[in-house]
Structure formats: structure tokens, C-alpha cells
Amino acid sequence: MVDFPSRFEVIVIGGGHAGTEAALASARMGVKTLLLTHNVETLGQMSCNPAIGGIGKSHLVKEIDALGGAMAMATDKGGIQFRVLNSRKGPAVRATRAQADRVLYKAAIRETLENQPNLWIFQQACDDLIVDQDQVRGVVTQMGMRIFADSVVLTTGTFLGGLIHIGMQNYSGGRAGDPPSIALAQRLRELPLRVGRLKTGTPPRIDGRSVDFSVMTEQPGDTPIPVMSFLGNKEQHPPQVSCWITHTNARTHEIIASNLDRSPMYSGVIEGIGPRYCPSIEDKIHRFADKESHQVFIEPEGLTTHELYPNGISTSLPFDVQLQIVRSIRGMENAHIVRPGYAIEYDYFDPRDLKYSLETKVIGGLFFAGQINGTTGYEEAGAQGLLAGTNAALRAQGRDSWCPRRDEAYIGVLVDDLITLGTQEPYRMFTSRAEYRLILREDNADLRLTEKGRELGLVDDARWAAFCIKRESIELEEQRLKSTWVRPGTEQGDAIAAHFGTPLTHEYNLLNLLTRPEIDYASLISITGQGCTDPQVAEQVEIKTKYAGYIDRQQDEIARLRASEDTRLPEDIDYAAISGLSKEIQSKLGITRPETLGQASRIPGVTPAAISLLMIHLKKRGAGRQLEQSA
């Protein structure tokens, strides 16, 4: 066995969305980092749909960006259609979504990786972990090379024991065209970690030259074109294109229903549970039998390819059935399938065996991020990767680990849900999962996280300077509005009354006027002739002013809960020894091993009375230790 000539502080296994963010985060913090990938050509590859963002997901992307991550900037460089979803609703649920050119997105990620100081890339599959006395010491590659490191971050995606299904045929694979990680999967199953199987799928890809777009509904992007990154601009965007909408029909549903016996999912061949919120077309037909049709979004895969992604017809049915399904859909009667759809089963590990840092509880220095933790989606993977990479670097630096709270970031919601509740199906982020979504908007992710990112070493000088200018501009504009008064009967007062249809009864400052629902910031500054032209600053001023009462109420609630939320539970606490706790609650607490009282309170079945007993126990334990020290 040969040793690699260099030792690293952090090794990241896997070059997908979790792995790239993990490696970049660690390296940005000044830690010597190795990114180990089975194929350098697939770094940052979009394995499924060619899109970034969406409801709940864009919040994660913006948080990654606020902490210096690459996903949003790569989206701005590769995005070929941008839309703001829920644009007519409140700011808490608005979400930016971008179609991405696969080639351009992947190229942007690779360029970022190759130009990141402290980061080395090496092409080799990982077959084994070096573990000594419950501490990870490094990895062993497929050619028997040992590489030593203080911490290892596993971001293996769907590759662990990956099994691809098309009809009744199945074969080993990490995704179509890539080998699975069999040796590593077997090694991980030897560790004292709970393991399960999940499933995901992808639709057949269609040749756009064989599609009749004239009978479909065009879906253009938004104008003006949104940007994804806080540092992004429209000039970075490549040429923009449209998506198209068509629908399944009674004939489509009949084809699927009559072939369910040939579906590996319905014949019992597939054991893994698939994503609830991204079901296969056969699952939709079975679960929603009363629906006459389902939308199919025809999404371009890029500017230099004819391939289309028919979002909404993910399937693992045999190829001949896939062809019938596709050709039964309006506009695709003569469609040519370039790549068949398939389902893939893979190993995942119960995230309740992780700490908030995403370090495993049983092996020191071993971190998990992405689909290995039971999540689905590029954005969820990227967020976990950034957090795991950050904490691996903090460990190397001898610093305390970090994870944002539920009231600080969607990343915090994601991790808390996973390590507290676990998951039996692929976990997807939604805004509805966050209790404090009015303060966790996508538009203020930088105001929530960039200062912390700077403290951790994740945010570079350029981003920090831009952020400081923005933050100061918001404060100055709020002060200007607060100190600018308008009186009834004056030229400005009459202009405001005429424009908004609201007569002024007495003197108002502009900040007071902006709280009114009928008055918007853009119109206000056009009348007064003064104001901020930076759209990000203007947006923050308007949202903070109009929703101030609701935001203050949420902040008060957070402050009340924070004391118990942050109270830490000792790692060696013996729940069986706490009198008054039921056997059921003792068992649940013993299995999850919550890190704080707040986390304990969110375990299903753990009652407020049980939390009170824990608080009493902690006070007694603290008093007992003080007596021991004074004796």
C-alpha cells in the first residue's frame, strides 16, 4: 500500500453539489483541503433537472451565497431562464428559480474549484476509511493509496450501493454512465450507524428537433431578469430562452395503468422510498387517479444542445412504455428519446446519528453531507456541504463547531429537522418548514449570515466590502426617510396625496408614509426626487418598513425561546436515571441524543413536562458539581 506524498487537514469525497461547496468552504477558511472525485470531468454536474432554486430552495441558495459559496454565482453564469415564483405573494415565500445550461453551470463550478487557494483535486474513487480508536485518520483509494487527514467529509450522492432500474432490468451504477461505490458502501455498513435505502428517478430526455412547440404553451422568463447571487448582475447571464408547458392526458394514464405490473416500483423490485414531492409519473397516476391530466414542463438542457428535460414524467417503466408515454403527450407525438428515464436506489444513513456540525456521533472527524443524509435536491446538498466543510475546517483549526439556529437560516431548519426527526423519505426544503419565515427571506440572507461568514473565514474581502456598503446604505436611507417630513398643503404633500389617493391630514415623515399598503418606495422617491437607486437596498428598506410590526413580533418570540433553545445537554447524560421520565421518552431521548433542550423539545412524543424535568435535572446536576468543586 502506497501513501500519498502530502497530508491534508480535510478530505472531501465526491464532487457533486455537496462536495464542491464543502471543499470550497474548507479551503476558503485557509485549511489544506483535498477534493477526491472518481471523475474530474463530472465536478458540479447536474445529474437530474437543469434548474437551481424554487420554493424554499432558493432561500438555501442565497444562504450559501451569503456565506461565500459558489452555487448562486455559477447559476448567474449558467442560467438561461430566470423567474421569481410567488411574486404576487408576500416576501417570505417569494423564490427565484433559474433554468441552467448544464455545460455552463458545470464549467463555472470547475473554474471556481481550480482557482481556489488551499484546494487540491485528485481523481480517484474512495474505497475505504482509515479509522483508529473511533477517529477518522484518512482514506484509501481504489488503487490502494492511503491519504491521511484530520477530517473526512463524505458527499457520495446516489453512489453508495447504487442500483439503476429501467423496467425489470437493473444494474449497478452511481448514475447513468458512472460506476457505483460498492466497496465504500460495504465499509460504511460495518460502522455502528443506522443505514437504509432510498430511491430517486429521472425522466427520459427528448430531442427538441422532434417536438412540436406550436401546440404547447410558452413560458418565458421574467423581465427585468432576476439575479441569483447578491454579487451577481444581468451582464453575467448567457442568452435567455423559454420553457414550454404541455399535459398528460387520458391516453397517457391508460398506458401507465396498463403497464404498472412492469414497473419495478409497483412489482416490489425497488425497496427504497422515493421523494414525496417529486413523484414518478406512475406514482402520480396511482395516487391521484381522479386527475385527468398532469402538467409537463419542457425545459431546455442548454444553449448548445437539442436535449430537453420533460419535468413531470420521471419514470422507471421499460423503454417501450416510456416511448408510448412520451408520444401520447401533445406536441411530442413524434418525439425521439435521447436517454431513457430510470430510477436509482442507494444507501443513506440515518441523520439522527449526526451532530449539528454534521459530524457523526460515533466516528470523530467523519462528516456526512447531501443525499447520504436522506435529502433530495442540489440546494439541500449544497447547504449541507458548506456546513460540513466549514465544521471540518473549524475542527482542524481547533475551533468550536457552528450551525445556524432555526431562527437564523433555512440551513438551520434543514439540519435541525434531519438530526432531530430523521427521515424515511427523501427530504425536500419548503418555506412551510420554517416557523420564522418572515425573517428568513431569500432577500435578506446576506444580512442574516454574511457577518457570521466573515467571522468564520468564509467571506472574502470583495464580498465583505460590498456587503458593508449595502448594509450602511440601508441604514442611511432609513434614517433619511425618518428625518424627511411632508406637510399637507405643500407641493410635495399635494403630489403624494394626488398620486396615492390618500390626503395628508397632518405632518408625516416618509418612513411613516411607506408603512401604508397603498404607498410603494419607487413611487415615493419618484415624487420626492430623492432616494436609493440600488434595487437590493430599496427592497430591504420597503420590506423592513412595511412588515416591521410582524417582524418585531417574531423577534420577541425568538428572544423568549432562546434561553431554553440554547441550553446544552451533556453528552454523558443518563436519561434512564432521570426520575419522572416515561420509558418511552427515555428511549427517544437516548436514541436521538439531542444536543440542546430546544432540540429535545422537537422530538416527537417528548412533552413539555419532560422538558421541565430535564431542566430540573440540569439545575440539580449543576448545583451538585458546584458542591463537588468547593469540597
Curated annotation (Swiss-Prot):
Q: Which UniProt keywords apply?
A: Cytoplasm, FAD, Flavoprotein, NAD, tRNA processing
Q: Which Gene3D superfamilies match?
A: FAD/NAD(P)-binding domain, GidA associated domain, C-terminal subdomain, tRNA uridine 5-carboxymethylaminomethyl modification enzyme MnmG/GidA
List cofactor names only: FAD
Primary location group: cytoplasm
Which positions bind FAD?
A: G14, G15, G16, H17, A18, G19
| Record GO terms (molecular function) | flavin adenine dinucleotide binding
Pfam (any one): GIDA_C_1st
In which residues is NAD(+) bound?
274-288
Q: GO biological process annotations for this chain's record?
A: tRNA methylation; tRNA wobble uridine modification
Described by its record, this protein's role is as follows:
NAD-binding protein involved in the addition of a carboxymethylaminomethyl (cmnm) group at the wobble position (U34) of certain tRNAs, forming tRNA-cmnm(5)s(2)U34.
The record, for NCBIfam families, names: mnmG_gidA (TIGR00136)
Q: Which HAMAP family match?
A: MnmG_GidA (MF_00129)
Q: What is this protein called?
A: tRNA uridine 5-carboxymethylaminomethyl modification enzyme MnmG
Species whose genome carries this gene: Pseudomonas syringae pv. syringae (strain B728a)
The gene it comes from is mnmG
